[in-house]
A protein has these predicted regions:
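STAS-like cytosolic regulatory interaction modules
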Residues: 1-57, 61, 67-110
Length: 110
């Protein structure tokens, strides 16, 4: 079964928006990792917004990607904000990860 997935990046003076639509899983995560890596490597602007409101599915690969992005941005001095679709939020809820835990994950370096 072929699923549709798209990742796009938009950069303004204030922020970088990395938007994803479709299914975020082991097959599509490398595209998102590349976009995040490019944004961090550019080193400006220092605000990244993950717009994952268009995701229809997210597996544990997406959870790992979000956690590693929180840490990576914190270590690089970036502010990170995110918008999650209901399916993505359900994936986080299923494993007990909530916004406050995500934020503290980046702060304490756990």
């Amino acid at each position: 079964m072929t699923t549709h997935f798209a990742v796009s990046t938009e950069t303004t003076d204030e922020l970088v928006v990395i938007a994803c639509t479709g299914e975020l899983d082991i097959a599509t995560a490398p595209d998102v990792e590349r976009a995040i890596g490019d944004a961090v490597a550019a080193d400006t602007p220092k605000l990244i917004r993950l717009d994952w409101s268009g995701l229809t599915f997210m597996d544990s690969t997406g959870i790992r990607l979000l956690l590693s992005t929180v840490r990576r941005c914190k270590e690089a001095g970036f502010e990170l904000v995110w918008d999650l679709s209901p399916p993505a939020q359900r994936a986080l809820d299923a494993v007990g990860i909530h916004d406050d835990l995500l934020r503290s994950y980046g702060e304490n370096g756990s």
